[in-house]
Amino acid sequence: MLGRTPGNIQTIRPLKNGVIADYEVTERMIRNFLKKVNPKKGLASPRVIICVPAGVTQVEKRAVIDVTREAGAREAYLIEEPMAAAIGIGLNIFEPEGNLIIDIGGGTSEIAVISLGGIVKTSSFRVAGDRFDTTIIDYVRQKHNLLIGERTAEEIKKKIGAVMDLEEEECIEISGRNALNGLPRDIKICSSEIVEALGDLVQQIIEEVKVILE
């Protein structure tokens, strides 16, 4: 809904950067999820597993467990995002070998080495999808004098997002408001521009990977 609501409606993010930003709204959101998976009254409340960034504090973890139980879960368990990502792609996390996981989420990115069923080393930092979107917004405004919203920035990222030059350039047409006169305007933007826009952020991720591998 970001970028698509009228001016009299506010879009709220219950979770931000991987942790609870609004406790009450988070509780309502989880309660709604539980009703969808368990609509009939009288059935036992479900057990819930929630992913959290590897770098969150014990206080932040406790808040997630508490809000999930208050929302109606019988039991709440946490799993660190890199571990969930490893399981999701089919890795045998119990093998006596190291697996490097890079999980670029919305608010945070997670880099972890996993072996023998545990996380050996990890780094959690706030350079991820949301930062990509705001960086694209700033780039388009500065280079093209065009004002776009988060919805358009995400569309650009998904359709032509790249971190290195492609063999064949990809371009799309986007709409926005002229920053000089406020009038609607369309422009063509290409993947090479996104490579330029995201270069610094990508380099930050690369540096974090180097630290983990040292």
Name each model-derived stretch.
Residues 1-104, 112-214:
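Nucleotide/phosphate-binding catalytic cleft detector across ATP-hydrolyzing
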Residues 107:
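Conserved Rossmann-like nucleotide-cofactor binding loop
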